[in-house]
Curated annotation (Swiss-Prot):
Protein name: DNA-directed RNA polymerase subunit beta
Entries under InterPro entries matching the protein: DNA-dir_RNA_pol_bsu_ext_1_sf (IPR042107), DNA-dir_RNA_pol_su2 (IPR015712), DNA-dir_RNAP_su2_dom (IPR007120), DNA-dir_RNAP_su2_hyb_sf (IPR037033), RNA_pol_bsu_bac (IPR010243), RNA_pol_bsu_CS (IPR007121), RNA_pol_bsu_protrusion (IPR007644), RNA_pol_Rpb2_2 (IPR007642)
Predominant subcellular localization, coarse grouping: plastid
Entry similarity comment: Belongs to the RNA polymerase beta chain family.
A single GO molecular function term of this UniProt record: DNA-directed RNA polymerase activity
Gene behind the chain: rpoB
Length: 1070
C-alpha cells in the first residue's frame, strides 16, 4: 500500500502482503529470539561447555530453483549456519567452528512454501488473547455470579470466583478451588503485602480465620496446601524441591505464562504498570484481578465481550514458525547433551560439527508443514483461489475450537469485524463462521490484532489523515461508513451520516464524526469484492458466489467481464500468474517458451510457464502479450497467465442468457445451453493429470523398466520407446501402457513350463520369472502426453526409488452434467445441449446461449444478476466495460436502475434496435421459439451475464459398478468412486420405489445387489448362462448383523418363513 499522511492512499495493499510480512518477521526477529534462548550445555562433570554464537548466524541461498524443487519433489529451503564453540575448562581452550543447524523452508513470491515438491501455505489462526476477562452468569437461584478468567499464553485457564459471602476463590481444576490468599502466598506474598496491595483489605480479612492464617503463615505451608488441593492428594505431603518443580511444570508454566501480549493486556485491563519484559503472572496481577472482581460485585467496572476482536489475537505464520523453530532447538539441545555424554563415556574428542546434527530442525519443519492443521496444500484451481487461500483466518487448530463444540456466538458476525473480517466470505457446512477471510485492507499489527485503515478527521486540520487502528482503538470513536466519494475528500459531506459507535450503528451529525471509512468495500474480502451489484443480493447467495468463484476452471479462451468491480486487475497482478516487466526496455525475441528483452544494455531472458499442472489438475499456462521490437515500460504485462486477459482476472465468459422456462429442462436450477458452447469452445478447458510409478529393489532383485513385456498385446505397448516409457506427444487411450515395468519374483516348481523344467534339470539354468507391474492409464484418462519426468535420486536403494511421472493433457468441452454458475450464487447443472437452430432467438435472429430458470431469482433474492445481465447487454452492444463500486444506492434512490436503463436506451439508439429498450417492460424483450418461429407469450429478460465453469465436472464424478469389494462387517458394497463402490439406496430411494410398486426391483436392490452373499453369487451365475434368478431362502447379511447386535443387548429376535403348502411355519436361525 502507498500510504502518506498528506496524500492518503492510492492503491490497495498487496493481497499477499500478510504472508510476506509474517515470514520476514520470523527471519528478522523470531530466529534471533529463539537462538538467544539456546542455553550453554555442559557435561555432567562440567569439563566441556558448548555454546552457540548467535549474533553472526547465516542463511545460505537455496541450492535449487523453485521449478526444480517442484518437479523433483524437493523442499525449497535455505541452510542455516551458526558459529559454535566448544570450551575445555581445564585447559581453557576453545574450538570454534561454523556448524550446519538444518534447513528452513523459504517463502516464494506467491507467499507459499514448497515442501517435498508441494505448494504449502500457512493460514492465520484466531485465538483468545492472553489476559483476564470478566463475565457474569446466573446461578440456579437467578443470582448473578461474577468470574474472572485468566488465560495464559499457552491457552491454560484459571478462574477467580466470588461467592455470596464475598469470599474469593481460585479454581485450579474443574472440581477443586482454593482461597485467593493461599494462591497469593504460594506465589511468594505474605499477608501484610497482600493487604497493602488491595483496595478492599477489610473484605480479605473478613473471611480469614485461624485455620487460614496457619495455611498462609509461611510460603512452604501455602505451597503444601496449594499442592494438596491441586493434585487432590490426601494425607500430609512434605515440602520438597521436587514438589515445587512438579507444581511449576503442571500449573505455573501452563497457566501463568502471559507472554508479551498477555502482559500488555493485563496491564491495560487492571491499570498496572508492570514492566513489559515480565511475562509471568505475579501476585500483584492476582490481587488486582481480585479487586476488580469485588468491584464487579458492587456494580463497578464493565464486563468483557469474549467475541470482540480486541480480545482476540492472530497467530500468524511468524508465530507458528517461531514456535516450531524453538521446538527444534529444544530437540537439538537434548541431542547435543546425549552426544557429549556419549563422547566422554567412550573417551572421544568431540568437535562442534560432530556434536550438532541437522535432523531435529529439518524433521520438525517437514512434520509441521506436512501434519499441522494450519499448514494446508495451496489450492491452485485459478489465480483468485491462490490469493484468497493465503488470507484465510481460522478459529480451528491447536489451542482453538472445534467444529462440533463451537457455539453460535463464536460463529456469528460481530460489529468489531467491520473492515477486518469479511461478514460474507466463510465456508459452508460444519465450519461456517469458524473459517473466514480477511477484508481487503486488513493487516496484522505488532500485537497480533487485525488493523484496518480510517480517515482521521481532526478539527484543526481540514486534511483527513489515514491511520491504521486495532479493534480496541475505534470502539469508542464515531466511525462514518465510507462512501464512494471517500477518495475525493474535497467534496462536502452530508449533514447527517450513518455511523458506528460502541458496536451500535447509529445516525450521527457530521460534526461529531471522528473517523470515516476509506473505501466502499473496505469491509469485504477479495471474493465478495468481485461481485458486481452485491448490495442487491441476499448474503447467503453472496457467500456461495464467493466460494464458487474459487472453483472456476481457467478456460481455453478467457474473456474479461463486461460488468466488474475494478478489483480484477489487482487480483491478477498479486496472484503472480502474469509475467510483469521488472525493467523498461525493448523486446528482442518472443515465442511460447520465453521472452527476451534488452534493458540497460543487458539481455534478459524471461522463461514462461508452459502447461504446468496445478494440484487441482487445472492447466497453468502463460501467453505472450508483447510483440518483437516493441518498447515496454516497467510494470507492463509481458504475458497473461491462466484465467487472465490483459492483466485482469478473467474466470468465465460473457454469454447471452435468457430467464424463461423451456420444456422443463431448466427446472430445479438446471441449465439449458446451445451447442455453440461446445463447437466454438466457449467453455472448453484443459486439464492435466499426473501418473507416476516407482521402481524398488526387492528381495528377489531390482525392478526393471523395459518395453519387452510378455503376455501383453502389442497394441497396448505401441507408444513405448526403447526404454519402456511412453513417448512425448503420444495420444493415449484407456488401458494403454504408460511405463513398462517388470518385478522379479520366485515361482513354484509347478508353475514352470515343461521346457523350463528341462533346462533346469539338464543344464542347471535358473529361469527367471517376472511379474508385470506396468503403469496403465485408468478409465477416463485419455489424452495427449505433454511431459515425462524420470527422477533418479542418489543411492538407488529401495529407500531412494526412481520415480517416473507422466503428465497427460485432456481437452474437456462442456457437457451434460457439468456445473456452471454466475457471480451471484446462481448455480446449475447442464441438463441438455440443444441445437442452435432450436434455441430461442432474439428479434435480430441471434440465438440464446443459455436459458436459466426465472424462479431461481425471487426466492433466492439475488437480484444483482438481473442488473448485471441487462448492463452486460448494453456493454456488449456499445463495446464498453463497466467497473462499478458496490452500494451505489448511497448516492440516491434506485441508483443501480438509473445506471442500467440509460445505458440500455443508448444501446438501443446506437444500434437502431428498439427491442433492446422497450419502455413498457424495460430490460425485457419479445423473443421467438427456435423450433416453431412463434413468439413466446410473455416478454423475457435477456442480456449478457458472466458465467463460470466450475471444477465439479461430470467426467470426474460419473461412476458405475458391476462388481467390486464389499465391507467385511455388513457385506455391503463399499462407498465412493475411488473404492469402486456401489450406489446407496437409502430410505427415500426405497420410498420412491415403493411409490411405483416395483417390488422385485426393490428386493433386488436390498438383497441380491447388496448384502445377500449366496444369492448374489447365484445371480452372477444365472446372468452369465441365462436363466431365472432363484429366490433367496435365508436372510441378508445386514439382517443377520442386526440380530447379533440385538443379542448382545440380551434381546432374542427370530424370523420365520411361512410356506403356502399346508401353512407350515418353519423357524429359521439367523
Amino acid at each position: 500500500m502507498l500510504r502518506d499522511r498528506n496524500e492518503g492512499m492510492s492503491t490497495i495493499p498487496g493481497f499477499s502482503q500478510i504472508q510476506f510480512e509474517g515470514f520476514c518477521r520470523f527471519l528478522d526477529q523470531g530466529l534471533t529470539e529463539e537462538l538467544h534462548k539456546f542455553p550453554k550445555i555442559e557435561d555432567t562433570d562440567q569439563e566441556i561447555e558448548f555454546q552457540l554464537f548467535v549474533e553472526t548466524y547465516q542463511l545460505a541461498e537455496p541450492l535449487i530453483k523453485e521449478k526444480d524443487a517442484i518437479y523433483e519433489s524437493l523442499t525449497y529451503s535455505s541452510e542455516l549456519y551458526v558459529p559454535a564453540g566448544l570450551i575445555w575448562k581445564n585447559g581453557r581452550d576453545m574450538q570454534e567452528q561454523t556448524v550446519f543447524i538444518g534447513n528452513i523452508p523459504l517463502m516464494n513470491s506467491l507467499g507459499t512454501s514448497i515442501v517435498n515438491g508441494i505448494y504449502r501455505i500457512v493460514i492465520n489462526q484466531i485465538l483468545q488473547s492472553p489476559g483476564i476477562y470478566y463475565r457474569s452468569e446466573l446461578d440456579h437461584n437467578g443470582i448473578s455470579v461474577y468470574t474472572g478468567t485468566i488465560i495464559s499464553d499457552w491457552g491454560g485457564r484459571s478462574e477467580l470466583e466470588i461467592d455470596r459471602k464475598a469470599r474469593i476463590w481460585a479454581r485450579v481444576s474443574r472440581k477443586q478451588k482454593i482461597s485467593i490468599l493461599v494462591l497469593s502466598s504460594a506465589m511468594g506474598s505474605n499477608l501484610r503485602e497482600i493487604l497493602d496491595n488491595v483496595c478492599y483489605p477489610e473484605i480479605f480479612l473478613s473471611f480469614l480465620n485461624d485455620k487460614d492464617r496457619k495455611k498462609i503463615g509461611s510460603k512452604e505451608n501455602a505451597i503444601l496446601e496449594f499442592y494438596q488441593q491441586f493434585a487432590c492428594v490426601g494425607g500430609d505431603p512434605v515440602f520438597s524441591e521436587s514438589l515445587c518443580k512438579e507444581l511449576q511444570k503442571k500449573f505455573f508454566q501452563q497457566r501463568c505464562e502471559l507472554g508479551r501480549i498477555g502482559r500488555r493486556n493485563m496491564n491495560q485491563r487492571l491499570n498496572l504498570n508492570i514492566p513489559q519484559n515480565n511475562t509471568f503472572l505475579l501476585p500483584r496481577d492476582v490481587l488486582a484481578a481480585a479487586d476488580h472482581l469485588i468491584g464487579m460485585k458492587f456494580g463497578m467496572g464493565t464486563l468483557d465481550d469474549m467475541n470482540h476482536l480486541k480480545n482476540k489475537r492472530i497467530r500468524s505464520v511468524a508465530d507458528l514458525l517461531q514456535d516450531q523453530f524453538g521446538l527444534a532447538l529444544v530437540r537439538l539441545e537434548n541431542a547435543i547433551r546425549g552426544t557429549i555424554s556419549g563422547a566422554i563415556k567412550h573417551k572421544l574428542i568431540p568437535t562442534p560439527q560432530n556434536l550438532v546434527t541437522s535432523t531435529p530442525l529439518t524433521t520438525t519443519f517437514e512434520s509441521f508443514f506436512g501434519l499441522h492443521p494450519l499448514s494446508q496444500v495451496l489450492d491452485r484451481t485459478n489465480p483468485l483461489t491462490q490469493i484468497v487461500h493465503g488470507r484465510k483466518s481460522s478459529y480451528l487448530g491447536p489451542g482453538g475450537v472445534t467444529g462440533r463444540t463451537a457455539s453460535f456466538r463464536i460463529r456469528d458476525i460481530h460489529p468489531s469485524h467491520y473492515g477486518r473480517i469479511c461478514p460474507i466470505d466463510t465456508s459452508e457446512g460444519i465450519n461456517v463462521g469458524l473459517i473466514g477471510s480477511l477484508a481487503i485492507h486488513a493487516k496484522i499489527g505488532f500485537w497480533g490484532s487485525i488493523e484496518t485503515p480510517f480517515y482521521e478527521i481532526s478539527e484543526k486540520s481540514k486534511e483527513a489523515q489515514i491511520v491504521y487502528l486495532p479493534p480496541s482503538r475505534d470502539e469508542y470513536s464515531m466511525v462514518a461508513a465510507g462512501n464512494s466519494l471517500a477518495l475525493n475528500r474535497g467534496i462536502q459531506e452530508e449533514q447527517v451520516v450513518p455511523a458506528r459507535y460502541r458496536q451500535e450503528f447509529l445516525t450521527i451529525a457530521w460534526e461529531k464524526i471522528h473517523l470515516r471509512s476509506i473505501f466502499p468495500f473496505q469491509y469485504f474480502s477479495i471474493g465478495a469484492s468481485l461481485i458486481p451489484f452485491i448490495e442487491h443480493n441476499d448474503a447467503n447467495r453472496a457467500l456461495m458466489s464467493s466460494n464458487m468463484q474459487r472453483q472456476a476452471v481457467p478456460l481455453f479462451r478467457s474473456e474479461k467481464c463486461i460488468v466488474g468491480t475494478g478489483l480484477e486487475r489487482q487480483v491478477a497482478l498479486d496472484s503472480g500468474v502474469s509475467a510483469i516487466a521488472e525493467h523498461e526496455g525493448k523486446i528482442l525475441y518472443t515465442d511460447t517458451d520465453k521472452i527476451v528483452l534488452s534493458a540497460n544494455g543487458d539481455t534478459i531472458s524471461i522463461p514462461l510457464v508452459m502447461y504446468q499442472r496445478s494440484n487441482k489438475n487445472t492447466c497453468m499456462h502463460q501467453k505472450p502479450q508483447v510483440q518483437r521490437n516493441k518498447c515496454i515500460k516497467k510494470g507492463q504485462i509481458l504475458a497473461d497467465g491462466a484465467a487472465t486477459v490483459g492483466g485482469e482476472l478473467a474466470l468465465g465468459k460473457n454469454v447471452l442468457v435468457a430467464y424463461m422456462p423451456w420444456e422443463g429442462y431448466n427446472s430445479e436450477d438446471a441449465v439449458l445451453i446451445s451447442e455453440r458452447m461446445v463447437y466454438e469452445d466457449i467453455f472448453t478447458s484443459f486439464h492435466i493429470r499426473k501418473y507416476e510409478i516407482q521402481t524398488h529393489v526387492t528381495s528377489q532383485g531390482p525392478e526393471r523398466i523395459t518395453n519387452e513385456i510378455p503376455h501383453l498385446e502389442a497394441h497396448l505397448l505401441r507408444n513405448l520407446d526403447r526404454n519402456g516409457i511412453v513417448r512425448l506427444g503420444s495420444w493415449i487411450e484407456t488401458g494403454d501402457i504408460l511405463v513398462g515395468k517388470l518385478t522379479p519374483q520366485t515361482a513354484k516348481e509347478s508353475s514352470y513350463a515343461p521346457e523350463d523344467r528341462l533346462l533346469r534339470a539338464i543344464l542347471g539354468v535358473q529361469v527367471s520369472t517376472a511379474k508385470e507391474t506396468c503403469l496403465k492409464l485408468p478409465i477416463g484418462g485419455r489424452g495427449r502426453v505433454i511431459d515425462v519426468r524420470w527422477i533418479q535420486k542418489k543411492g538407488g536403494s529401495s529407500y531412494n526409488p526412481e520415480t517416473i511421472r507422466v503428465y497427460i493433457s485432456q481437452k474437456r468441452e462442456i457437457k451434460v452434467g457439468d456445473k456452471v454458475a454466475g457471480r451471484h450464487g446462481n448455480k446449475g447443472i447442464i441438463s441438455k445441449i440443444l441445437a442452435r437452430q432450436d434455441m430461442p432467438y432474439l428479434q435480430d435472429g441471434t440465438p440464446i446461449d443459455m436459458v436459466f430458470n426465472p424462479l431461481g431469482v425471487p426466492s433466492r433474492m439475488n437480484v444483482g444478476q438481473i442488473f448485471e445481465c441487462s448492463l452486460g447487454l448494453a456493454g456488449d452492444l456499445l463495446d464498453r466495460h463497466y467497473r462499478i463500486a458496490p452500494f451505489d444506492e448511497r448516492y440516491e434512490q434506485e441508483a443501480s436502475r438509473k445506471l442500467v436503463f440509460p445505458e440500455l436506451y443508448e444501446a438501443s439508439k446506437q444500434t437502431s434496435n428498439p427491442w433492446v429498450f422497450e419502455p413498457e417492460y424495460p430490460g425485457k424483450s419479445r423473443i421467438f421459439d427456435g423450433r416453431t418461429g412463434d413468439p413466446f407469450e410473455q416478454p423475457v429478460i435477456i442480456g449478457k451475464s458472466y458465467i463460470l465453469k466450475l471444477i465439479h465436472q461430470v467426467d470426474d464424478k460419473i461412476h458405475g459398478r458391476s462388481s467390486g469389494h464389499y465391507a467385511l462387517v455388513t457385506q455391503q458394497p463399499l462407498r465412493g468412486r475411488a473404492k469402486q463402490g456401489g450406489q446407496r439406496v437409502g430410505e427415500m430411494e426405497v420410498w420412491a420405489l415403493e411409490g411405483f410398486g416395483v417390488a422385485h426391483i426393490s428386493q433386488e436392490m436390498l438383497t441380491y445387489k447388496s448384502d445377500h452373499i449366496r444369492a448374489r453369487q447365484e445371480v452372477l451365475g444365472t446372468t452369465i448362462i441365462g436363466g431365472t434368478i432363484p429366490n433367496p431362502e435365508d436372510a441378508p447379511e445386514s439382517f443377520r448383523l442386526l440380530v447379533r447386535e440385538l443379542r448382545s443387548l440380551a434381546l432374542e429376535l427370530n424370523h420365520f418363513l411361512i410356506s403356502d403348502k399346508n401353512f407350515q411355519i418353519n423357524r429359521k436361525e439367523a
